[in-house]
Every structure is written in structure tokens, then in C-alpha cells.
């Protein structure tokens, strides 16, 4: 059984503006989601990949990967919530999703051996310092160290340098959580399970990625301001 010592944080609502996701804080402030902020960093590689494999193949892979990732994430969340032992009939529903369930089965021993004392799961967070928000997968002890833990699926094993955006995102969650609760989190953990059953563990210190977080937020803010200027300019032209 996993031990839960969950910290209370306020719920956040979401709002889409110009196809970008924002979170509204209890004080009424709108902050972009960290995934939206980091989208630009991923775009060049994605565009090149789409060009290489073709749009139809790319769309199929993206759809199946998103479905698989969502299912595995839900299984991890429910397992850490002790559903398998406390609500076996509900847990049995997961077995209907064969491939995600098999992938989760590879992750399960890692969760059992290394994760405990859970502080939060699927939790909305924000930071006034960085003016960004998001939803974290899991905050818990990993090998006895308080950590931001993110679950990922992949078709093949990932090189460490492919994960930079993951590390920046997890570092942002660490900053958000400390600002909201006063609990410092320095370790970030990305767990990746591949279709051939390999589990990769990437353990980092958030300090290395905070400068990159600031850079990504500055880039997003600059682009967002330019985009809004163009919208306002077009509106003024129509009005005249």
C-alpha cells in the first residue's frame, strides 16, 4: 500500500486563447500552461519528423501515442492510489487496454520499489514568480527523495538529450509546488517505458534547467505579445 500525505492546493480552471492553454489562478490571473510555453522548443524537431514520415503516418503515430500515453498515465495514477488492492473490480477495467496494460506492467515494479509518501497526483499548480502554470503527474518520494515524477511512453528508447523539454517542465512544477506549499523539491524524475518493454529512469536536479525555463518563458512572452499586437492591429484596420 502506498502512503499518501497529500498537500492541499487550490483547483485551477483552464481557458483557451488563440489555441493556447491558459490557467486561471484563484486571484484571477491568467498564466500560460508550461506545455504551451515549451511547444516552440519541440516544434522544429516535430516539423522535420512529419516531413520525413509524411502527414498521414505522423498523424496516426501521434494519435496512437497520445492514447497509449494517456492510458498508461491513468494506470499509474490509479495504482499509486491503491486501486488495485482496494477496488479490484475498477482496476480490472484497465486490463481491457492490452498494450497500455502491458506497458504499465513494466513500470509497476519500479513504482512498487522506488515510489512512496505521495504528496500530490494530477495536481494543478502555478507560480507568480515565473508566471506559468500546469498539471503535474506525481509528487512523491523517489528512492527516499522528494521528487517531481513524470510518466512517459515511447516507441523506442530515448536519448537523454531528447528529454530537455521534459526536464524543464518538471523543474517548473518543482518551483510551482514550492511556491504554493513551501515544500522544496529539487529532484526531477522522468520514467519512460518503451514498446519493447524497456524502462528508462532519468533522474536530474532542477537547478540545471531553471535558466532554460526562464529563457523559454521569455521567448513565449515575446511571441505572445507580438501575436496580440498583430491581432489588435488587424482589428484596428477593420474598424477604420
Predicted regions and their residues:
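Metal-dependent nuclease catalytic cores that hydrolyze phosphodiester bonds in DNA/RNA
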Residues: 1-133
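Mg2+/Mn2+-dependent nuclease catalytic core
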Residues: 119-230
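Generic serine detector
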Residues: 8, 13, 33, 85, ...
